[in-house]
């Protein structure tokens, strides 16, 4: 269970992006929708431990994610609206690199994970192609594969 308690984030220019957000999210797959400027990206970056909220607490299965960021990074699949990738790297190589970062140490397990995900998102035939050459839809599918690495508890 992901629990946010009174999470607030105020940027240096005094813009209040989050104001006392309190919610519980069970394991599963979720999307976050809202108008421009509603704080969606700020909330997701805080959950993913990419930035620290100004105040409040975020826990995942009772673990303080700000104190132990690796605990959630290993169990979270995150697909931001704009995900930066190295455009000249192939889809296969990038997913393999991401698998290493997610803690998949064994080369056989990494190979199986990457090949399975590329097949699931229908990118197997272009696995050796640089991501820069992908269409917008192909990049989105690549991002989905990236978010699914390591069979995360929360996506």
Feature annotation, model-predicted:
Residues 35-39:
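Walker A (P-loop) phosphate-binding loop of ABC-type ATPase nucleotide-binding domains
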Residues 48:
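Helix-to-loop junction immediately C-terminal to a conserved catalytic motif
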Residues 144:
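Hydrophobic anchor residue at the start of the ABC signature
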């Amino acid at each position: 269970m992901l629990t946010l308690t009174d999470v607030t984030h105020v940027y240096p220019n005094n813009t209040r992006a989050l104001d006392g957000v309190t919610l519980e999210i069970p394991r599963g797959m979720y999307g976050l929708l809202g108008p421009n400027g509603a704080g969606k990206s700020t909330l997701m970056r805080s959950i993913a431990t990419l930035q620290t909220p100004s105040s409040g607490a975020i826990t995942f299965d009772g673990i303080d994610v700000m104190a132990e960021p690796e605990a959630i990074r290993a169990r979270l699949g995150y697909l931001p609206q704009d995900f930066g990738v190295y455009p000249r790297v192939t889809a296969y190589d990038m997913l393999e690199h991401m698998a290493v970062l997610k803690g998949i140490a064994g080369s056989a397990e990494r190979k199986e994970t990457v090949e399975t995900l590329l097949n699931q998102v229908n990118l197997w035939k272009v696995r050796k192609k640089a991501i820069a050459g992908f269409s917008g839809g192909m990049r989105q599918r690549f991002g989905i594969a990236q978010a699914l690495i390591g069979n995360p508890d929360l996506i």
